[in-house]
């Protein structure tokens, strides 16, 4: 992925670290804020209240997620820790401290090595990342080592551990295969639209196994691959597992492939050469990572978080505290459908801990707009579940973030089963690249269209079709855009709407 050079990021982070409003405790590098400072910092314009963002500075690709020693560890080459993936403690702004000058630390992952396969000790956390050498026009894979529970990492003198002389060879994900007692790396051969598989006994010496691709959407690039097993949630194979390969494509979307891995090659099922199956239908979900469970404590549950932005415009967004934020955590599973395997994504259940008192509405839609009262006071920090009857021909939907003549429009047509999300009218700033619509075919379930919606200060996530289609969008609505409306072409459609105010995770 195209990144800001590491020395630029380092300078920005170090400058931010010198700001007088924050202090660091020796040894743990944990930032401490007074309640007044926290109130000021986390009430900046556009600051989301329950989507994670760094206190200050750049945050883009998730760079290694793991569950270990009873905590979720979340990296963007800063680091935050969490016990529930709802509340976060930012413990380091820059985990790599001694990378040679001129080398950029690009996307990668972090693993725990309790069996000491690498020889750095059984307490070691090891980051596997891409070194970008702009002068040599070369990308290679390297490792760094932590002995303070993953908060700071030291450069390995034997780097790079994998260098094939490519300019675009990046974004490793590394997992432990217990069956073979080997490490497996998936890494992108970006401009070839391929993912390469390598194996190693010690994270230092890597042997090529196979390449996957080109496949699916291959217009410009493959990058940021992730590889994991998922349980099937229905049908005759319910409870069994398949391998899933997720690849970020063309700097603005993700696609996935489902199949089997024989220890050497990944064999995708139902492979289509020219079209991919998308992880998310919105423009702002990219470079997602799943949490690798080194405690063996998650009972097979797989959680994912993605970067909610887009390389087409991310550097130009009007955020005062930095650039970028992450999605809500999603629990993943697989579903067997008439169209093949489909990824199911549902908000992590612990998010319900943020809910306040529910407000409930029901009735029949009238032709035109119906303003939902009392929602504007929630300030675009809420969760909603809405269902519409689909038995009669109609076009209806919701207007979110309504105010000052602007809104996010969600429209459904019962005849075509088309759901369209239009954000061309929502942002309170002008940027042509941001003016986008997205859509998908959404089949009714038991005669109902059901949408599970998360609205935050500058983004919206919409889960539809029981989690098989998700729309993630940045919105950047103005402070007065807090209204919610229902609308309908014809009258008579039954609806139910439940809304919960959500507490800020920063308090």
Locate each region found by the language model:
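Generic detector of low-complexity/intrinsically disordered segments
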Residues: 14-16, 21, 164, 400, ...
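Beta-rich accessory regions
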Residues: 238, 251-252, 262-287, 291-507
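Bacterial Sec-dependent N-terminal signal peptides
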Residues: 1-28
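Beta-rich carbohydrate-recognition and catalytic domains
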Residues: 24-171, 176-222, 231-281, 299-300, ...
């Amino acid at each position: 992925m195209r990144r800001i050079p590491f020395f630029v990021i380092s300078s920005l982070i170090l400058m931010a670290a010198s700001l007088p409003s924050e202090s660091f405790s020796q040894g743990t590098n944990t930032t401490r804020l007074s309640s007044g400072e926290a109130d000021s910092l986390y009430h900046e314009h556009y600051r989301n209240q329950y989507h994670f963002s760094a206190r200050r500075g750049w945050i883009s690709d998730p760079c290694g997620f793991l569950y270990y020693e009873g905590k979720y560890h979340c990296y963007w080459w800063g680091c935050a820790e969490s016990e529930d993936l709802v509340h976060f403690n930012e413990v380091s702004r820059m985990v790599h401290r001694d990378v040679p000058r001129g080398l950029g630390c690009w996307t990668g992952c972090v693993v725990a090595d309790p069996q000491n396969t690498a020889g750095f000790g059984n307490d070691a956390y090891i980051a596997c990342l891409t070194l970008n050498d702009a002068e040599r026009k070369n990308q290679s894979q390297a490792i760094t080592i932590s002995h303070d529970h993953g908060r700071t990492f030291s450069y390995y003198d034997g780097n790079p551990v994998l260098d094939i002389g490519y300019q675009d060879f990046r974004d490793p994900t590394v997992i432990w295969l217990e069956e073979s007692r080997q490490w497996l790396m998936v890494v992108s051969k970006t401009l070839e639209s391929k993912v390469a598989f390598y194996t190693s006994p010690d994270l230092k010496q890597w042997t090529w196994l196979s390449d996957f691709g080109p496949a699916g959407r291959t217009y410009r690039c493959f990058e940021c691959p992730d590889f994991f097993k998922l349980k099937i949630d229905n049908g005759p194979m319910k409870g069994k597992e398949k391998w899933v390969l997720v690849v970020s494509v063309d700097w603005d979307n993700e696609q996935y492939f489902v199949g089997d891995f024989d220890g050497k090659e990944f064999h995708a099922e139902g492979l289509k050469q020219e079209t991919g199956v998308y992880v998310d239908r919105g423009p702002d979900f990219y470079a997602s990572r799943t949490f690798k469970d080194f405690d063996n404590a998650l009972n097979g549950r797989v959680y994912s978080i993605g970067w909610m932005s887009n390389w087409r415009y991310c550097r130009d967004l009007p955020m005062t505290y930095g650039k970028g934020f992450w999605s809500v955590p999603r629990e993943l599973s697989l579903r067997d459908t008439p169209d093949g395997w489909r990824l199911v994504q549902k908000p992590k259940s612990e998010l319900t801990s943020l809910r306040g008192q529910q407000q409930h509405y029901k009735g029949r839609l009238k032709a035109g707009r119906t303003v939902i009262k009392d929602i504007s006071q929630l300030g675009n920090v809420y969760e909603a579940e809405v269902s519409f009857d689909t038995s009669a021909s109609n076009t209806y939907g919701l207007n979110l973030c309504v105010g000052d003549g602007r809104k996010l429009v969600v429209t459904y047509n019962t005849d075509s089963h088309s759901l369209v999300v239009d954000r061309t009218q929502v942002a309170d700033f002008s940027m042509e690249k941001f003016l986008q619509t997205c859509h998908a075919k959404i089949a009714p379930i038991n005669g109902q269209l059901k949408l599970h919606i998360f609205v935050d200060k500058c983004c919206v996530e919409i889960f539809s079709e029981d989690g098989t289609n998700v729309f993630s969008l940045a919105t950047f609505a103005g402070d007065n855009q807090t209204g919610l409306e229902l609308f309908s072409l014809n009258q008579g459609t039954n609806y139910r709407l439940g809304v919960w105010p959500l507490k800020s995770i920063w308090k």
